[in-house]
Amino acid sequence: MKLGIVGTGTIVEEVLPVLQPVKGLSCYGICGTKRSEAKAEKLKEQYQMQLAVSDYEKLLDSEIDTVYIAVPNLLHFEMAKEAVLRGKHVIVEKPMTANERQAEELCALAKKQGVFLFEAITTRYQSNYQFIKEQLPTIG
């Protein structure tokens, strides 16, 4: 998987070290804003990526097959939609969209395009999942 990362904020800085050892995953490129070009370039060098850009279209035009979107929430829907329309798999930070209509539209579009669409959320530490985990041994 060739991953393109959108965003240069704290969450991206926390995710990149975790992604590095994942077999079969290559962090190919990163896209920031004009204001964060220097930071994108620094992250590119630090994590041996091929590409650092401030133009989202250039990232989508590259060799990536999957996009990880970690930008301000109000941008999630439009950026995810553009990636799906370009045939890219999408992992988008929570909340995936601002409302149910947008979520339904994105899901339908991803299905039509034959790509995966994920919201980046870990549930295993939530109390309801912890409760289920504790109860599993008692029910066999």
Model-found features: residue ranges?
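N-terminal Rossmann-like dinucleotide-binding module
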Residues: M1-Q46
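Beta-loop-alpha module in the N-terminal Rossmann-like domain of NAD(P)-dependent dehydrogenases
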Residues: S36, Y47-L109
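A contiguous active-site-proximal alpha/beta segment in oxidoreductase catalytic domains
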Residues: T97-G140
